[in-house]
Every structure is written in C-alpha cells, then in structure tokens.
C-alpha cells in the first residue's frame, strides 16, 4: 500500500514524498506519464499529481496515462496537478493576470483538506496559470487576495486540488493538510524506522539465501556504515565489509570507523593503501586527474583485497532513492538485482566485470530515513550525523599537488574547525562544513618573526538538496576563535579566510 506521486517536473516533488514518509505513510515517485500497469504495481491508496512548469492548455504538456483519473482512489493535484484536474473535468485554466510567487495568506479556507486546521494559513505560491472556471461537481475551498480559486475539491469523486505547495517549509501548516489527505485515503501510517529495518532484513535474507556471501565497500560515511550494520544483522559473518584507508581521510577517521562497527558485529577488513594512493598522486595538480587516479586506485585496492577473501555472490551498495527515482527528468534504474555493477560515489567506481548480484537495501530510502535506521541500529551519532565527505577525500580539499605534509596540515585544520562547530553548538545547523588548504602563501608576523605560510579557507553551507546552497552565517566571534586556534596550533598556517559564496555560482567543494 502506498501513495503514488506522479512527477510532472516540479522541483519540490521529492519533498512531497518525504513529507508523506515523515507522516508515516510509504510513498513512491513515478514519472507523470507512467502506465496504469506500472502505477498498479505500487498498489496505491492515493495519487498525487505534482506541480510542473507546463501549461495544461499546451498540446505538448505531459499528461497522466489514460485511465489514471478514473481510478477509484483519492487524487490530490498540486499546482499544475490541480489545473490538470480542473481542465480534464471541464473547467477553464488561463494565464493569470498577475503571477503569484512567494508567501500568500489564505483569506478563507475549509473542506476536507483543511479539516482541523485553525488560525492563519500561510501558503507558498509559484504559478502563472489559474483555474478561472470550476468544473461541475467541484467547489472552491480556499482563496487568497490574488487567487480566487486557491483550493478545490469534489468530495463525491474524492478529487482535490491546491494552487500552492503544501510540502515546503514556507507553508507551515502544509503537513496538516497532507495528513488530512492521508486520512481521506485511509492509508495505514506504519512507515517507521523499526518497520523499515524489519522489512529490509527480511528482504536481504530472502535475496541472499542461507549461504550467499556478501561483499561491501565501506567509506566511513553514514550510508555505508548503516548498511554494514543492517547486513550484519541479516547475514552475520557471511558479510565482509572492506574499508580502504587511502591516506586521504580525516584525522582519526579510520580508528573511529573500526571502533564503531566491529563491536556491533560487523566483519570489517581494513586495507592500508596509503602508500599506493599517495604515490600515484605525486606530482598531480589537476582536480579531475586526481579524481581519476583515486578512482583507479580504489579499483585496484578493492580487487587485490577481494582476491584474498575468496568467492562472493553479492555486492552490496548504499544506493539511495534519489539515485533511482523514476522522475520526469530521468529513467528508472533496473530493479532486477542484475549483475552489472554501477559506480558508487563513495568508492570512486567499481570494475564493471565484477560478476556479483547487487544488494541495494536502501534504494527506496531517503537520506534522513537512513539516519533514523542508523540510530535504531546503534551507529554512534558522530558518524550518523556526520556531514557528507567526498569519495576522493581530502585530496580535493588540498588544492594543487597532494603531499603527506599538506595532508597533515589540512587534517589538523579540519579537526579544529569541525570540533569547534560541535563545541559551539553550530555543527547540526550546517549541512556541510570543511577546510581547504590553498596553495597560497603569504607574509605574516608571529611573535617577532616574519612568516611566509599557507592560507586556509573555511567553508560551511546550508542546503536542503545540495543542488543549491547558501553559505552559513556563522557568528563572527566563532570565526575569530577558529582563526586564532588554527594559526596558534598549526604553525604552517598564518592566514584564515571564510568562504561566503553560494552555490551557484560556486560548488560546495573547491575542486
């Protein structure tokens, strides 16, 4: 049982799915044009038609497959979805005289979607088309000053529409509205971390069988670490997790990963490949070349180690739902568990000729759901809530050639910055924070002596999706404290700068 979200190109479609799941209801995203058969495979109790950039009166506008609107389940249209419902039922949709974008107050609201909601209702608008004439059987249940038809419903056919985005944080009571839709759909709200873990373990045991051996590459991040714990519960000693220390990790990271996973029953093999990686990177300054070399060395190290460990039947990967969503802008990944191995962002790509079957337990989960599972499985918070860390590690935060000396400098600076964020209670408010060792050296004075030392850049950002990001407005006093600590504790550095560039135009990482 699920809520199926048909995606017509809205940037917020994933948020709809996440909001339903936060409310305890399993939801899936399919292309807006998904066939009736494909939708039926999800056994939907309700359907959502997402927003999108198209206009319903455009002949090229995407439309649900024939028969979707006739299904005997409640349907909620959001923005474009509402306009489509009205248009298909015989109503009129026209270009709005005034485009509405941003926050708007509902001047009145009611009906089943708004049941139990009281007080001011602020909605996030983003539309240039409007419903100008209602189809038969529908009634207006909400309006704003500029949009007389802001929400509609047909309680007999159980068709509902809103001309705003209930899924975004800018619509504070949107969660209550979505909860009301779930109530209308009579969805069982049992999508909890405990339920997910129980189902995933059963699925893995069914796929792997009683004797299958599973190989997993560990990066030290939350996804692969959580996957290791889940697989250990599912298949025990038949899991072998391989952690490759390439010398590009953060300070003490190898020891932290070993201390976190081994006591929880993970059969962990650590490979010391620092010499091979750093040797291959010697003399290389180009960022793309560094990435390629690291990817190649990962494959070599992984192949060397797996050759020692014997035969495996399955390769586990921490693929997440956003990687395989059947969206308007992409294609659905193969669900067959077939043998072609795709590159994993944490290990720089695995060889295509590894003839394993894939085990991807997290392919239906969002990142926040993995974190919830991690907590249930006992993963320590310092790993569970850790910021994203790139597969190439500190190599792409050490601008120019990577050397052991530079890495040691960067590790200490990074540790001071991240530890400081935790100490000041700022870490969880940042989506990602990092230090960059630049190739810039500048003149300074320490004591009575002239210095000519490195410049480091600190960067922290906030983001919901990592597609765009804002630089984090960290307090001046905190930044001053960090600068003081860094130049006093890391003598090879005499200048600290803070990156205040958003994404775009910059990327989060410097390389």
UniProtKB/Swiss-Prot annotation:
It comes from the Bacteria. Keywords: ATP-binding, Glutamine amidotransferase, GMP biosynthesis, Ligase, Nucleotide-binding, Purine biosynthesis. PROSITE patterns: GATASE_TYPE_1 (PS51273), GMPS_ATP_PPASE (PS51553). The keyword Ligase applies. ATP binds at residues 219-225. It catalyses: XMP + L-glutamine + ATP + H2O = GMP + L-glutamate + AMP + diphosphate + 2 H(+). The active site is at residues 79, 165, 167. Pfam families: GATase, GMP_synt_C, NAD_synthase. One of its GO terms (cellular component) is cytosol. Residues 191-386 form the GMPS ATP-PPase domain. Its EC number is 6.3.5.2. GO terms for molecular function: ATP binding; GMP synthase activity. Residues 2-190 form the Glutamine amidotransferase type-1 domain. Pathway: Purine metabolism; GMP biosynthesis; GMP from XMP (L-Gln route): step 1/1. HAMAP family: GMP_synthase. Homodimer. PANTHER family: GMP SYNTHASE [GLUTAMINE-HYDROLYZING] (PTHR11922:SF2), GMP SYNTHASE-RELATED (PTHR11922). Catalyzes the synthesis of GMP from XMP. This is GMP synthase [glutamine-hydrolyzing]. It comes from Deinococcus deserti (strain DSM 17065 / CIP 109153 / LMG 22923 / VCD115).
